A protein has these predicted regions:
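Helix-loop boundary and gating motifs at the non-cytosolic
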Residues: 2-61
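Hydrophobic core of transmembrane alpha-helices in multi-pass small-molecule transporters
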Residues: 22, 103-121
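Small/hydrophobic positions within alpha-helical transmembrane segments
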Residues: 23, 55, 59, 86, ...
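Intracellular juxtamembrane helix-capping segments at the cytosolic ends
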Residues: 35, 119-134
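Loop-to-transmembrane helix entry/capping segments in MFS-fold secondary transporters
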Residues: 46-47, 134-147
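Helix-to-loop junctions at the C-terminal end of transmembrane segments
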Residues: 62-76
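C-terminal ends and interior cores of transmembrane alpha-helices
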Residues: 85-102
């Protein structure tokens, strides 16, 4: 069993993009909770925290297919590099806006921009596997590996 995983991870670039995908997936699952805990901790308001987190997650759900389509048309690096940079800036500004007690509307704007700039990392990595491997058996093994990575 492990032989098959070693075989696909030995392919050129496979270990690098698979590990990058693993690291990139980690914060996605807990970011909504992190927003709630941070904002509640700073402001004392679960209501504000929940609304800001909801804005982030709803915008993420609405824009995910748009980002996926752009990636399909223009390529991963062309689309994702500016999106990741924008995401980091938006989340940083969200933190600053809450911590420095800026106008709450800006917090919603930064949450929306942060949510709008989240790519589907699992899909991006699986797409790379589809282009890298040559046999259906290897592809099945690669997707199995990615399923395990999704659960970590």
């Amino acid at each position: 069993m492990f032989k098959n995983y070693r075989e696909i991870l030995a392919l050129p670039g496979a270990l690098r993009f698979s590990m990058a995908g693993l690291v990139a997936r980690m914060p996605i699952a807990v970011l909504g909770l992190g927003i709630v805990l941070f904002i509640q901790g700073v402001t004392g308001s679960y209501g504000l925290a929940g609304i800001v987190a909801a804005v982030y997650m709803i915008v993420q759900a609405l824009t995910g297919p748009v980002i996926a389509r752009l990636v399909d048309r223009r390529g991963q690096a062309t689309v994702m590099v500016p999106i990741v940079v924008t995401h980091l800036i938006a989340l940083s500004l969200l933190i600053v806006s809450v911590y420095l007690d800026w106008w709450v509307g800006l917090t919603f704007v930064f949450a929306g921009i942060g949510g709008a700039t989240v790519g589907s990392v699992g899909s991006l990595v699986r797409s790379r596997w589809s282009h890298l491997v040559t046999s259906p058996r290897q592809l099945q093994t690669a997707f199995s590996w990615e399923s395990v990575a999704d659960e970590l």
